[in-house]
């Protein structure tokens, strides 16, 4: 027996009289007509009286309407696999050769001229396909560029990680070399410093590993997105256009490009290489340095008002000028005096007792700096000083002067000179086991440097207390020595 109905014509016979769509969960009324379950539910909810069949107008009871199982099976059998839409217009039986840009659906020529799409922007399917193909190619190109950027970022992270580890290895060697000179007295401190360094390095490497893992994850997602999008390019025209926008958006959203730019992590250890020993000295109550001869003051440089005593280790400003030869090395205006020993290399530490003086200055001066007239107290003139003014203001003499936030009133000032490193550091040395930094000058030292003391004017006796270069003391105190 031959079939007289085509599939589209059969679909017309399988439309619900209410929604005019193919039946969904069809129910059969007592009169024999069928309707979608949702259509009957909606219709019965809006009626105050009993329901009548929309086709034959017979009164029916929806609550006793059974499912039309046979009709449902016929509909399921006619439905295409994967629920793929047809390529022929269901209304006009013409090929779906156009695409409505507003409604985002395929239409035929008559739909665009006479149907609901006649005032919409329509484009040939081939044109839409070409346009979307170009968009896909552009997105793939962008993903490839992002992929290259991520690869470059990963390379920088790997190099940064390697550099951190190498610098850590170098610094670890420096620590071991320094601690070998301290022998058994610093074994415990060496273990502590190495542990701190390793922890610092682990933290930096862990941070870089985390960034590396994130970047590699992004790289993998970009590669997957790139592969999925490239596969879309092999689909048929209709399949490609139908799934392009949704699939492309989903894949690209899951593969967001790496945010930010590469920012390298610098290896900055808590200890400066040159200060390892100094830090250990603080912890070991300054017992590790030998005690060479202490500094002495040079009378030939002292201002005429200055009086030296106790083997040229104590100086104070007197009321009357002393009769002294006016020689080039002597200060004739500023109340200053130099130590007899200067330094042109190495690392050195000494202390000065300032007691309760209300005004004082100390530091180092170039041997060639002028000592005649008012002293130019600035690094530009070869003078590096800190001091106390009127018992209240601590300051570093730079350009301009810099007030120093000093806690309390230190009676003993430590001075640490690292000639090659170009560092001059001042400490509050009141407590033997705790050197608190007051200020550090950074400079390119040239020529011999001499410790300098400036007692400042006696102010009619109110500032007449002495400044003292303390002699070598027992194991509880640091003494002058070359590091």
Curated annotation (Swiss-Prot):
Disruption phenotype: TRIM50-deficient mice show a significantly prolonged survival time when LPS-challenged when compared with wild-type mice. TRIM50 deficiency also significantly ameliorates NLRP3-mediated inflammation and tissue damage in vivo. Gene3D superfamilies: 2.60.120.920, Classic Zinc Finger, Zinc/RING finger domain, C3HC4 (zinc finger). Transmembrane segments: none annotated. One of its GO terms (molecular function) is transferase activity. One of its GO terms (cellular component) is cytoplasm. Auto-ubiquitinated. Acetylated by EP300 and KAT2B. HDAC6 drives TRIM50 deacetylation. Acetylation antagonizes with TRIM50 ubiquitination. PROSITE patterns: B302_SPRY, ZF_BBOX, ZF_RING_1, ZF_RING_2. It is found in: Cytoplasm. Residues 127-169, 203-236 form a coiled coil. Its main location: cytoplasm. Changing residue 372 to R: Complete loss of acetylation. It catalyses: S-ubiquitinyl-[E2 ubiquitin-conjugating enzyme]-L-cysteine + [acceptor protein]-L-lysine = [E2 ubiquitin-conjugating enzyme]-L-cysteine + N(6)-ubiquitinyl-[acceptor protein]-L-lysine. Zn(2+) binds at residues 89, 92, 111, 117. Residues 275-474 form the B30.2/SPRY domain. InterPro entries: B30.2/SPRY, B30.2/SPRY_sf, Butyrophylin_SPRY, ConA-like_dom_sf, PRY, SPRY_dom, TRIM/RBCC, Znf-RING_euk. One of its GO terms (biological process) is regulation of establishment of protein localization. Can form dimers and trimers. Interacts with several E2 ubiquitin-conjugating enzymes, including UBE2L6, UBE2E1, UBE2E3. No interaction with UBE2H. Interacts with BECN1. Interacts with SQSTM1. Interacts with NLRP3. This is E3 ubiquitin-protein ligase TRIM50. It comes from Mus musculus. The lineage of its organism: Eukaryota, Metazoa, Chordata, Craniata, Vertebrata.
């Amino acid at each position: 027996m031959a079939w007289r109905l085509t599939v589209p014509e059969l679909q017309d016979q399988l439309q619900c009289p209410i929604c005019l769509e193919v039946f969904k969960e069809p129910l059969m009324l007592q009169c024999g007509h069928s309707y979608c379950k949702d259509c009957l539910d909606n219709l019965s909810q809006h009626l105050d009286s009993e329901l009548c069949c929309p086709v034959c107008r017979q009164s029916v009871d929806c609550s006793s309407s059974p499912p039309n199982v046979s009709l449902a099976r016929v509909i399921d059998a006619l439905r295409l696999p994967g629920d793929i839409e047809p390529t022929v217009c269901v209304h006009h039986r013409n090929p779906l050769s156009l695409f409505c840009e507003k409604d985002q659906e395929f239409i035929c020529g008559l739909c665009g001229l006479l149907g609901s799409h006649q005032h919409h922007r329509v484009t040939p399917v081939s044109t839409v396909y070409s346009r979307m193909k170009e968009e896909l190619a552009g997105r793939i190109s962008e993903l490839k560029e992002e992929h290259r950027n991520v690869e470059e970022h990963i390379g920088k992270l790997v190099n940064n990680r390697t550099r951190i580890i190498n610098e850590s290895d170098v610094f670890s060697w420096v620590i071991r070399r320094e601690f070998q000179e301290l022998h058994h007295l610093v074994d415990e401190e060496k273990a502590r410093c190495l542990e701190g360094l390793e922890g610092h390095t682990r933290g930096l490497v862990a941070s870089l590993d985390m960034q590396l893992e994130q970047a590699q994850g992004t790289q993998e997602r970009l590669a997957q997105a790139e592969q999925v999008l490239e596969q879309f390019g092999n689909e048929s025209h209709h399949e490609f256009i139908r799934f392009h926008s949704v699939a492309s958006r989903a894949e690209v959203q899951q593969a967001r490009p790496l945010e930010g730019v590469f920012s390298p992590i610098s290896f900055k250890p808590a200890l400066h290489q040159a200060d390892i020993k100094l830090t250990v000295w603080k912890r070991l109550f300054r017992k590790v340095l030998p005690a060479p001869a202490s500094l002495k003051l040079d009378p030939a440089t002292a201002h005429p008002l200055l009086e030296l005593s106790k083997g040229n280790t104590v100086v104070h400003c007197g009321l009357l000028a002393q009769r002294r030869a006016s020689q080039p090395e002597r200060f004739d205006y500023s109340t200053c005096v130099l130590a007899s020993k200067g330094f042109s290399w190495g690392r050195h530490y000494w202390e000065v007792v300032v007691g309760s003086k209300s005004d004082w200055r100390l530091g180092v001066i170039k041997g060639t700096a002028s000592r005649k007239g008012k002293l130019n107290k600035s690094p530009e003139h070869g003078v590096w000083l800190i001091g106390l003014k009127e018992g209240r203001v601590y300051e570093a003499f730079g350009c301009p002067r810099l007030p120093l936030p000093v806690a309390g009133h230190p009676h003993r000032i430590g001075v640490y000179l690292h000639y090659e490193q170009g560092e001059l550091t001042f400490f509050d040395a009141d407590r033997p086991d705790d050197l608190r930094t007051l200020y550090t000058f950074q400079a390119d030292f040239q020529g011999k440097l001499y410790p300098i003391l400036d007692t400042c004017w006696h102010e009619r006796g109110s500032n007449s207390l002495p400044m003292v270069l303390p002699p070598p003391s027992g194991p509880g105190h640091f003494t002058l020595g070359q590091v």
